[in-house]
């Protein structure tokens, strides 16, 4: 079990928290993290590309010329794939690019990212994080108090925190159940509350 300093919203010490080694202390598996990010990005693809095959192209119902006697190659439709303006063979059609991964792999990926944050000292734990109203200025002030710069991912169930972060280019706030591998990798610093740590450990430990 590893101990990590806990701070309040003003950047002052507020005790320590003991982190579960099964979640925050494993050997990071980069290949599983990579596969998980590829899966997440695949699930975001629109998959709406579509072309027309010979049955979808308008026209071409009449045989262009008789079968025999003209000296030309036999043709059944002017919308056959070999014709200019004809249908496309094996072209893209609307589909979902999403696919599944085993639950153990998904959990190993997020645990690997959390453990890497611990190794890199990019994990910050707050005793609590709450805002009375959505104010971006207050959130910026809090981040300055914590001496945090660069890209920051905040994990908090407080809706006001999530709304306050929407207008900041390098800050993103997600609920605990919205914590994912791609965001955790893309954002340098990770800010968790003690309640968030507890919920994460309940699921992953």
From Swiss-Prot:
Position of the signal peptide: none
SUPFAM superfamilies: Ribosomal protein L4
Disordered: annotated segments: 43-96
UniProt keyword annotation of Nucleotidyltransferase present: no
GO biological process entries: translation
UniProt keyword list: Ribonucleoprotein, Ribosomal protein, RNA-binding, rRNA-binding
Pfam families assigned: Ribosomal_L4 (PF00573)
Basic residues composition-biased segments: 51-71
GO molecular function per UniProt: rRNA binding; structural constituent of ribosome
InterPro entries referenced in this protein's UniProt entry, alphabetically: Ribosomal_uL4 (IPR002136), Ribosomal_uL4-like (IPR013005), Ribosomal_uL4_dom_sf (IPR023574)
Residues forming coiled coils: none
Gene3D superfamilies: 3.40.1370.10
Keyword Manganese: no
GO cellular component: ribonucleoprotein complex; ribosome
NCBIfam families according to UniProt: rplD_bact
Chain's role: One of the primary rRNA binding proteins, this protein initially binds near the 5'-end of the 23S rRNA. It is important during the early stages of 50S assembly. It makes multiple contacts with different domains of the 23S rRNA in the assembled 50S subunit and ribosome. Forms part of the polypeptide exit tunnel.
Family: Belongs to the universal ribosomal protein uL4 family.
Subunit relationships: Part of the 50S ribosomal subunit.
This protein's name: Large ribosomal subunit protein uL4
Organism annotation: Lactobacillus helveticus (strain DPC 4571)
């Amino acid at each position: 079990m590893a101990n990590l300093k806990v701070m309040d919203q003003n950047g002052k010490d507020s005790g320590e928290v003991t982190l579960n080694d099964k979640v925050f202390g494993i050997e990071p598996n980069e290949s599983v993290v990579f596969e998980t990010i590829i899966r997440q990005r695949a699930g975001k693809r629109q998959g709406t590309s579509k072309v027309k095959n010979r049955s979808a192209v308008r026209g071409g119902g009449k045989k262009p010329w008789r079968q025999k006697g003209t000296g030309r190659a036999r043709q059944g439709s002017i919308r056959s794939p070999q014709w200019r303006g004809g249908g496309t063979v094996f072209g893209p059609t609307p589909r979902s690019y999403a696919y599944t991964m085993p639950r153990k792999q998904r959990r190993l990926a997020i645990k690997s990212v959390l453990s890497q944050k611990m190794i890199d000292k990019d994990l910050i734990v707050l005793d609590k994080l709450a805002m009375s109203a959505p104010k971006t200025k207050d959130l910026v002030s809090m981040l300055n108090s914590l001496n945090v710069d660069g890209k920051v991912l905040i994990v908090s169930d407080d809706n006001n925190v999530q709304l306050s972060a929407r207008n900041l280019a390098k800050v993103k706030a997600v609920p605990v159940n919205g914590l994912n591998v791609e965001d955790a990798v893309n954002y340098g610093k990770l800010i968790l509350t003690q309640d968030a740590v507890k919920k994460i450990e309940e699921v992953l430990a």
